[in-house]
């Protein structure tokens, strides 16, 4: 999958116009999920909340293969998830396996430093990320 810098609202607009897509919000919580998605997954058990809203939900486990078929989803969304994943490269491989394309939203060290006043890992963050615009690569 190619990596490009984009904006959350651009992606939400695209998804709202393409309702036929099978969209997974991976790492969502019930209080903060993308309304454009039609399948949801997280390590916490939100099944009851999502099922009451007639939304498809799958509980996943850390450091385990994701319980989805190869290329099952047209689009996979990760909003502030990658920085928490202990096995980053294996997790990336799983994302490529289950999704045809997607959107990954990441915090930056600068943002976390300004907002939280520290450049130490916080809120369970295991990684810092930086996008190299010239070479179109994500550094960690």
Residue ranges of predicted features:
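Conserved N-terminal segment of class I S-adenosyl-L-methionine
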Residues: 1-69, 75
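A short SAM/SAH-binding and catalytic strip from SAM-dependent methyltransferases
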Residues: 74-86
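Non-transmembrane, interaction-prone segments in cytosolic or luminal domains
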Residues: 11-17, 25, 41, 70, ...
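Glycine-rich loops and low-complexity Gly/Arg-rich segments
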Residues: 47-52, 62-67, 82-83, 102-103, ...
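S-adenosyl-L-methionine-dependent methyltransferase catalytic module, highlighting the catalytic core
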Residues: 86-140
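Active-site flanking residues adjacent to catalytic metal/cofactor-binding acidic residues
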Residues: 24, 41, 79, 104, ...
């Amino acid at each position: 999958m190619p990596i490009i810098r984009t904006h959350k609202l651009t992606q939400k607009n695209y998804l709202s116009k393409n309702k036929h897509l099978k969209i997974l919000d991976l790492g969502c919580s019930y209080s903060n999920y993308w309304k454009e998605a039609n399948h949801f997954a997280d390590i916490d058990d939100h099944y009851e909340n999502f099922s009451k809203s007639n939304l498809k939900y799958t509980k996943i486990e850390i450091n385990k293969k994701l319980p989805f078929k190869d290329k099952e989803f047209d689009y996979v969304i990760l909003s502030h998830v990658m920085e928490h994943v202990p096995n980053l490269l294996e997790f990336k491989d799983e994302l490529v396996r289950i999704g045809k394309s997607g959107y990954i939203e990441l915090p930056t060290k600068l943002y976390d430093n300004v907002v939280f006043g520290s450049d130490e890992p916080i809120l369970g963050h295991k990684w810092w990320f930086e996008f190299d615009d010239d070479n179109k690569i994500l550094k960690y």
